[in-house]
Amino acid sequence: MFSLQKKALQHIYMTPENASQLTKDLLQHLGLYWNGPVIKMDTVVHLHNKIFSNRSVLKYALAKQANITIIKTLVLWVEPEYALAQALKHNRKDVLECIFSYHLTTPKYHHIMHLTSSQELFEFFHLFICKSKNYNARMECLLYAATLYNFPNILEKNREYIIRHSIGNTLFAIACKERHIHLIAWFVTAGVLDTYDDSTLFNTAFRLGDYSLLEVACDLPIIYPDYLIISMMQTAIQKNYFRFFKKLLTHFNIYRQIIITDAAYYNRRKILLLLLNQNVFNNFAILCALSAAIKGHASKKTLNLLISQLDSQMTVIDSVYYSIIKYNNIDCIPLLMQIKTFRLETLVSIAVHGDNIDIIAACKAFLPKDTLYHLVLKMAIISRNHKLFKLYTEKENPMYIFTTIKAIISNLVNYTVVQAVAIEYLREFHREKQLPIVPLLMVLAEHNYITKFKKACYAANMSDQKVKRALIKCLFIASQKNYCQIFKYCFGSLLKVLSKHERVKFFNSVVFAKKLASYYDHQNMIHLIDSLIERFRYLIKD
């Protein structure tokens, strides 16, 4: 048999005429299983009037378990890398030995090591291609390759070496990167890691978007700290990995306000629905989430979902209002009005304080004009926002603005300092617009601003009948509210400008004012009126 093989090898390079000596039976016996003569012609093989590439011939020979002697010749016809790759695929150690004997100085072929499924062949192949003379370097190279190409048996075999040389963490990182699930589990449970960072596997799973890695991390026999799981859940929300989030939620059952808040901020309605269906979040947590949704300009569907979960009697927290204003989210206002406790008045007040013109303008569609102007001007006065005050007063009817400010002053009766500021705004506006003096006199008398009242009277035309009638009304106001100084000043001013005929009517008014004072039991006012009547009776009689 050997002589026949030798003869075949001698004639395998012969010309077609001489190669005809290789009969069909002989070729079959040698293990080639081809018909006709075999002739090598550069990069192809001529066989029975058919042309085959050298690679296909070698591949076919290996697949058919051809005789090693023939294969030794065929491997010379192809490049070494291809020959090695085919030998690895077919788990032919003898062919590898043959190739390495031909190529004593081989380049690095680490990239084809994974083609074999045999652990023994993998190690044997690595023995030849790793040229380092240092034992540790060779071992680390082998273990790196075993991790890279998923050969757990090699790692288990060298477990003590991995522990002794502290290379477990490096290899573990490779296993995570390559998504070798079984290897990852082995690294964590085999005790080969120096310091296992709980976040490594989770971070790798998120970075690669690999759900199977996340499952491995969850199923490992490790007790993870809550802060890590919360952090991973936040990452899942940010990346919108619903499957990842659901796995973490169902596996660890961790519910925190920050989770629902993040889901609302990033507009993750599917995740929000999953969280809300658990019925573990109270109204305050949902309101905080609503505030975050407004901050993140979430969709109307997300806002409606959160609003629908709120108790109708739950008071809207300030952060909701501040989020609308700070992040200028106008679109959410109509939706928030579904909440019974949502107050546009509060929103406008905060918007004025924050000088947010857009929000104030948006509220025009939902509030009556009187209410809106009352709120805006009131807050502009309180915050001394001259710019906003001017913006809302310069184009409006002056008397309408005057009446509005008058109402604001009346509402501030218990806030003396703020009321004084409002009075100053009113006087300044009155001066700029050159309005009639009478309404101003009435307001100053109503709120007992004696000094400003005297100044207004000094500027008024006291001979004007309207001014006279206004001062008489101020008498009644003063007697009703026990403003003795206002009464005394009005009394004296009127006596100076009234005619004899008018003084009689004036006396009747003073008598009526006394009756008002008696009705309200203002003893000081009664004594004052009596003394004034007694003192100036002669003027009335004349």
UniProtKB/Swiss-Prot annotation:
Keywords: Early protein. Pfam families: DUF249. Induction: Expressed in the early phase of the viral replicative cycle. Plays a role in virus cell tropism, and may be required for efficient virus replication in macrophages. Belongs to the asfivirus MGF 505 family. This is Protein MGF 505-11L. It comes from African swine fever virus (strain Badajoz 1971 Vero-adapted). The lineage of its organism: Viruses, Varidnaviria, Bamfordvirae, Nucleocytoviricota, Pokkesviricetes.
